[in-house]
């Protein structure tokens, strides 16, 4: 690039001189330009051919070539007077640079230039050369002739990023080179097999929390029925009245008027939205659960309009390059530890390690591989909509129909080759982050590993809610990610290929017959979605706030979610930049420790230490107890997922504190919730055993169409016998022998996981159902796990 610029300057200067001389006019600064370029050429030529060229010979060559009448001849060697030797070159006599040895050869047209060159270096008279030293030479600088020039070069301040070290210690472990699990692919894709330095946190971090819940007070009977409906009705008064089973039918059969940007529609595509309706289980409680959405052209078009089209244009005019440089500089200054960043080497060998991990975990078909990343069309995406909707946190379900989210994704062959690079980038980002920054992802970077002291001493919490985060991203966010990936050591050819393909991409939903294109916005669902959104979020926060301020104790970022904990309230004068500069519709909703739909609480462990506990948001959790999109085949997985999150509610203090936080989040202190805490206390009994979970969650009579007849005929009498038991006079069911036996058997089985009468007391890996299935008996009649029997599907419920 420097050579191109130099050639352009020479070209324009020559053109200017030619135009002037053609009219017989010499430019005013002609002599100055010649002096500068002549001196530059002499120095460059001498430095390039230092073995046989000196400044004297180069000057003779240049001056001789410039004279058309010059005839090359042997120049007599002149004796050098040491008095005139310059300070920096003992082999050149600057006082004898005239070329004209004969009187008939005139150099009158260059006398001024020669006079200038002859005095380019000067030692004052009366001073011997040997007495000159470094210090004495400086004393005579004022008497040395200055170089006349009209070019004034102003000293521009160069912003240097100082190095720092926050004291965070990360284990660097050397990993030897490993063999590829698919050598034919890794060789073709130019993935190198060599050793590398692993930057993961190893034995210094735990993969599971230490905290265990205390037993619920004896005043609460865990055998009482779980009924969260009063709490949901209290928080969302209109959710119970909404029956959305026929909402999609209205969308498909009624007239519709949509304003969308340019897209392609295949009108011959038709999807039956009634297919599979009779396979969905009917819940017992109406608490705002949403029905399954069938991918159709209209449903997909509604989702695309909201998630991808009609991009908001909120940015004002700004200098793109200046803002880009400031964003990257502030990110590296405020977010990254420069000492650890300087230790990062270019990626070499790490991509093969993560490539092998991807093959082991995902087991993609190797036939999907289409070639190296630079030869694959990364700008072609596939599209689909999510058939399961998120619970609604506002009481507007009766007036607004929720729109499903969209997923934009590459084929497996592309993901297979791009995921290893982004996994390397994520590990490197976690390595260089300062200690006050938390990115909850992976086994060794979870919320409970946060420093509880920072959370406990934080008095102010800044939660930032970005609306339309993915589709609002533009060129600025695109270029910021590009620069940050290069700073993390990702190969430049890969980064360039990836981001060039994201300047404009073509998306196609073949099942629904829709095609459209987008420019810089986030492709929700590709291999870089989470990491890219995290980088963008941290960049915005570092630009709007001074994250290096000691007032800020911690910063948590995960995708588009973020939380800042501080001692004093953060300044708000720059928060409008989120809209006017970064094009994000931004809300700052609550002064609460809340991130990723979880409340953060500081709890005390058994050994006296403290730990951060992430508690699910009850406003969403209670709505999941009345699902309308469950099928029999996923019922056991749904039960297992509830076991993994409801174990925290075995502690009465956690239930109380969570209820207070959720109450304030919903009503801002204007209303008290009477049933929320009791509903949270009763949640663990819901998953005490699978039998109780099925009985309290599923309406078997209404779900008869999707349950096998022989299983249903066994279930109904079994439930009827348990429901029609002897009750006391107050209407409270009396415990029977079957209840006690069933509870005892469930407790004995769960005691193996260190719990009694509860689903989980700590986070553990998913159960080994093969070992569990051998520890219980099987019932040939019902196939349902009761106090005596277990299912025939490796411990799962078999209703079909």
Swiss-Prot record:
Residues 791-800 have a biased composition (Basic residues). Residues 774-790 have a biased composition (Polar residues). GO terms for molecular function: nucleotide binding; RNA binding; RNA-directed RNA polymerase activity. GO terms for biological process: DNA-templated transcription; positive stranded viral RNA replication. Residues 459-574 form the RdRp catalytic domain. Belongs to the ssRNA positive-strand viruses RNA-directed RNA polymerase family. It catalyses: RNA(n) + a ribonucleoside 5'-triphosphate = RNA(n+1) + diphosphate. InterPro entries: Bromoviridae_RdRp, DNA/RNA_pol_sf, RNA-dep_RNA_pol_alsuvir, RNA-dir_pol_PSvirus. RNA-dependent RNA polymerase which replicates the viral genome composed of 3 RNA segments, RNA1, RNA2 and RNA3. Pfam families: RdRP_2 (PF00978). This is RNA-directed RNA polymerase 2a.
